[in-house]
């Protein structure tokens, strides 16, 4: 294993945002959108040094002339060429490190296809010549970050949500439930319901505007029906938002109708339980003896759990499903947007973790399948 003085890199490749930095730090150094943009138009200015692709914030700032693509959908990498561009950008432009000098810890969603992590492993060793690497499960890292070894994590990002029960540090794979409903679906739904108001958002660039509206103004209602009544009778819930061209739009009940989808997936035509019921179902798949500990340690993680009011609503919904005397505690750490990364930073800097890395030598001997043996 590499010498102790070389900091490991921690890269949490989310469907929406990539969080990257150095093990031992308390926050990621680089947070940028997991976007690759390609020009929609013909370049006419000679000598401008136009690129054929842009990554992250640069793609975001030039979005008016680009087609934006997300290479990670529902937590699974669907475009490896673009993914390589994102990693290249992470190492060389954001962190400014030589990847062949640092071990790298990557993250992935539970219940991902095996081929996905094999390919990640292969690219790290063959394209970037990493000396060592490891792939960790996102939700497990969030629990590390909250300082617990037992609990159930509801991790909801941009592309995928999942509930992962963990007991004394062991994830219980039979009880993990994956829900392909997350931030991006909420953004799409917000685009749809704003269209009903007469505001048209259609392009990939406009989707980013709607995502911003969602992040700034949406919240979870404690009682949806009652909130709808309030919205009808008073304008107290209305907020205005200024679009990049200076036009001001007003949004009212969309503010809480959008995230309500998390609790009522039928809003977007999904036949699935909401996040509260999924969490409950996940707990019920666990041994009867450990359920009490899970109810009392329900940890929220990921950007889509950042809506104001979500913890209170979860508390209310799970209380109505659980046995009446059960103590239920929803833990919503303020830094939960980055708790996967923070957990990775903690894990990669533990002395006991150093023998867990997959080294280049092991990879050369066994090939990409080594990742299933060495990583949970």
UniProtKB/Swiss-Prot annotation:
Catalytic activity entry: ATP + H2O = ADP + phosphate + H(+)
EC identifiers of the protein: 3.6.4.-
GO annotation, cellular component aspect: cytoplasm; cytoskeleton
Protein name per UniProt: Actin-3
Record's function text: Actins are highly conserved proteins that are involved in various types of cell motility and are ubiquitously expressed in all eukaryotic cells.
Pfam families: Actin (PF00022)
Location, primary (coarse class): cytoplasm
Disulphides: none
Gene Ontology molecular function terms on file: ATP binding; hydrolase activity
Compartments in which it is found: Cytoplasm, Cytoskeleton
UniProt superkingdom: Eukaryota
Keywords: ATP-binding, Cytoplasm, Cytoskeleton, Hydrolase, Nucleotide-binding
Similarity remark: Belongs to the actin family.
Keyword ATP-binding: yes
PROSITE patterns: ACTINS_1 (PS00406), ACTINS_2 (PS00432), ACTINS_ACT_LIKE (PS01132)
Other remarks on this protein: There are at least six actin genes in Podocoryne carnea.
